[in-house]
Amino acid sequence: KRRYVRQLQENPDLRLEWNKNYDEYYPILLRNKAKHKVTPTHSLDELKKLDRLFPGQLNLLMCYYKGKPIGGTLNFTANSRVVIIFYNMIDDNYPELQPASLQIWETIRWAHGAGFKYLDFGVSQLPLAENPLTPSKSLILFKEHFGSRNMIRKAMGKQF
């Protein structure tokens, strides 16, 4: 994966940038979630509010191709040891540029440099399955290519 990402990084038309441009990011997030017939956990206003309420805890990495936003990763700092990739989204019109891979690679580099001990790659589920918590094998495999290990979160419920 490392050699592959290096080749992508050498593309002069691709640029990664840490910024706070939620207005550019949110339409990409909406389109990605719509593919799965779901909506984002947070509205655009909520993301901006969270960023104001918790300064430095939300970190947005945007990916641009020829100046156009084609992807972004929003990371939430959980504590001094853990950062969570909460949303890793791409514009499906640019699959050959592999923005998701670039974004994760840069997030790993950033998290390591910032001294985090753990990088949580987030959930890997199939929201359209009969059980929406069904693991997505292809998404898990994608994440494992970066050296991550999967863990199953078990949900328990009690009916009153």
Question: Each predicted region: which residue ranges?
Answer:
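Short, contiguous acidic/charged loop-to-helix segments that flank catalytic cores in large enzymes
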Residues: I90-Q98, L128-L133
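Active-site/acyl-donor-binding loops of N-acyltransferases
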Residues: Y118-F160
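Short, high-confidence coil segments that cap the C-terminus of an alpha-helix
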Residues: G113-F116
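A conserved beta-strand-loop-helix scaffold within acyl/acetyltransferase catalytic domains
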Residues: K1-P95
